[in-house]
Amino acid sequence: MNKLLLLILFEGVIFLSCSGKSGLESGIPKVSLVIDGTFDDKSFNESALNGVKKLKEEFEIELVLKESSTNSYLSDLEGLKDAGSNLIWLIGYKFSDVAKAVSLQNSEMKYAIIDPVYSNEPIPANLVGMTFRAQEGAFLTGYIAAKVSKTGKIGFLGGIEGDIVDAFRYGYEAGAKYANKDIKIFSQYIGSFSDLEAGRSVATKMYSDGIDIIHHAAGLGGIGAIEVAKELGSGHYIIGVDEDQSYLAPNNVITSTTKDVGRSLNLFTSNYLKTNTFEGGKLINYGLKEGVVGFVRNPKMIPFEVEKEIDSLSSKIINKEVIVPYNKESYEKFLKEFI
């Protein structure tokens, strides 16, 4: 689906700018949110949507939502610019290249991107990126998985292999090994964030192989995995991602590795609107310390003593006593140091 959704005006008054004061002098500012895929993914995109919706509690804005796809990124962004958007949010690493391109082409516009994959190259002054230490939250849920697994086998189901999902994977695997060096971990990618059936298929195979807990980071594929866990019933568990996904299968979702995209988006935009200053040209990084990543407490399935251990681990991560790996290289280094 590739349609433009215009939402009603929200309450409040705001002013926009870019690395200084904005050219906006009157009228109601327009904030746009562009995603790859659909807003109803019950995870990443939905979290971003919820974040901008919360702005209505403080500000009067016109919110424009756009569901896009790779072959229409440029035309969609051009349309939003021409429609008068003051700030355009791009949700997901797939927008990394196009975000830099349009920022350089349209210096009068303001852009923000979630999960960009940039190395050390300069970032345009009218672009800001939000990155996350998702591995820190995944470390905690990996620890939980290893502690509560009955079979000694746990799994990881990823979407598209790359920096973003790898952070979840290796954080999860490291946390599990930190809890139990003998735990068996099986990880697999399905090559998509929109293939529900592939997620179902891989999850079914993992459960049949004796894995009793799967952490997913696969978008709709993960929703398929949750469905399978629910259908199979007791003894088949799953760890959600980005948001608390326990409502999808209350008896099977042990916890979720949270990456509060919506909160980070809301924090930055709120400050932007209140101060009339856009702090672009940089990446802003969030983790456990900032309260943006973490895990969902679930006394029903997580023993009290394990939650106490998690609290201690969280402090060690925040204080940098434990440095959580985010890719294969740092994971192998972690194993040599801690396991």
From Swiss-Prot:
Coiled-coil stretches: none
Subunit structure: Monomer.
Biological role stated in the UniProt entry: Immunogenic protein. May be part of an ABC-type nucleoside uptake system involved in the purine salvage pathway.
Protein name stated in the entry: Basic membrane protein A
Source species, domain of life: Bacteria
Location (main, coarse): membrane
Membrane topology designation: Lipid-anchor
Subcellular compartments: Cell inner membrane
Lipidation (N-palmitoyl cysteine): C18
Gene3D superfamilies: 3.40.50.2300
Signal peptide: 1-17
Keyword Repeat on entry: no
Keyword entries, A-Z: Cell inner membrane, Cell membrane, Lipoprotein, Membrane, Palmitate, Signal, Transport
Lipid moiety-binding residues (S-diacylglycerol cysteine): C18
InterPro entries, per database record: BMP_lipoprotein, Peripla_BP_I, PnrA-like
Protein family: Belongs to the BMP lipoprotein family.
Gene Ontology, cellular component aspect: plasma membrane
UniProt keyword Lipoprotein, yes or no: yes
